[in-house]
């Protein structure tokens, strides 16, 4: 397995805006291999599948994903009705949801994007 930081360096990618994280329980391993991205100047939003059912076979509870990104100054949200961001508690006993983790400094930016009028198709 290769670390995201190593792959991005090899490909000379200097900016990642969004990560969809669904690796069937290996989320924490993935995040540990992405510390340069998570702590860089342009930190990505993350949509993560956070489920104890998936993480327990890997030997950790899903709340460790929550804790890891919270310690990196990310805040957790569920997407509510009409795309609103609903804060999620970081101290629940168990998790089973797709959640959004946003860097603290980009929360307002994402709220504005979600509130922007959508063009009709």
Task: Show the residue positions of the predicted features.
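Short internal loop-to-helix segment that lines adenine-nucleotide cofactor pockets
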Residues: 1-41, 54-60, 64, 120
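Short beta-strand segments
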Residues: 17-20, 47-49, 100-102
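Active-site beta-loop-alpha junctions enriched in small/polar residues
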Residues: 51-53, 82
